[in-house]
A protein has these predicted regions:
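Anion-binding (especially nucleotide phosphate/pyrophosphate-binding) glycine-rich loop
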Residues: 2-130
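FAD-binding subdomain of flavoenzyme oxidoreductases
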Residues: 121-123, 132-160
Length: 160
């Protein structure tokens, strides 16, 4: 049986768009369309969506789009944008910050400063998100994400 994304529209109606134009999702305002665009509001919904597509589609997780060049050719897969609950930021204790992957680097830097935590200053001028910064080990001024990262929680393409 062939997998069809259209079958998921009733279940994910507000957050799943087919044949989606990606131009406005990156800072360069360039690029073509994606076969599908899914906006994940929370972890539970993301897991549910990933389990439904069951590795039948290519996946690209898009952060702020600040360091992303999108081809004019159609992306034959699903672009996932993490929103809402992935923007959470809090203190675990006096020395450790928990930040969602959609938190901007600038916001993480400001949060650290407001809570008297040093070492995050370099993030104030990096345009992007925590998730993207970790993926590419973003950095400047001789500091990188590897210098502030303790651990991550991640999902695989199967939602586990």
């Amino acid at each position: 049986m062939k997998f069809n994304l259209k079958e998921l529209i009733p279940e994910f109606s507000n957050n799943l768009k087919l044949d989606y134009d990606l131009k406005k999702k990156n800072w360069f305002n360039i690029g073509g369309k994606a076969k599908a665009f899914y906006k994940a509001d929370n972890l539970k919904e993301l897991i549910k969506f990933l389990k439904k597509i069951q590795n039948n589609e290519k996946i690209f997780v898009l952060g702020a789009g600040s360091n992303t060049l999108i081809s004019d050719k159609q992306f034959n897969g699903v672009v996932i944008k993490l929103t809402n609950n992935f923007n959470n930021i809090s203190l675990l204790n006096e020395e450790i910050i928990i930040a969602g992957s959609a938190v901007t680097d600038k916001l993480l830097s400001e949060f650290a400063m407001e809570n008297s935590l040093g070492g995050f200053e370099f993030l104030s001028c990096i345009p992007g998100t925590v998730g993207g910064g970790i993926k590419m080990n973003a950095g400047c001024f001789n500091r990188e994400f590897k210098d502030i990262l303790i651990s991550i929680q991640a999902l695989n393409k199967s939602g586990q």
